[in-house]
Amino acid sequence: EYRARRSCLQEYAKAIDLPLVVRDDYGLRPFVRAVADDIDGRCVKCYELRLYAAAQAAKDGGFDAFTSSLFISPYQNHELLRDVAYRAAEETGVQFYYEDFRPMFRDGQTRARELGFYIQKYCGCVFSEQERYQKPNRILR
């Protein structure tokens, strides 16, 4: 899943001449360690791991701000995601760029299909993949 998403992003970035910073390590072990005691509450830990890493990468790279593609998904807990991102910004001293991209979700999916992009069917974690086969997706608001 991670490799498929990463490869698609790298191809797109190259096609539009977009500089891209990519972590080569998916970080499965740190993620599993972080969520082991509360698998059902894993999303906040995942958000923390991902957004703090993005903020730190922005700081290390001398960027003015950071954001996340997670903000386009209606399937994520948007408010929690935003709160974690602002905490990461405060702790790293790098501005967090906030925009609610959810209204563009369907158009983005359509465009991605037109371009032949890989479209994931779940958030990407192994627990979410399991849930994907157990119950229908629900949209969080």
Protein language model regions, located:
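Nucleotide-activated chemistry modules centered on ATP-dependent adenylation/adenylyltransferase
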Residues: 1-141
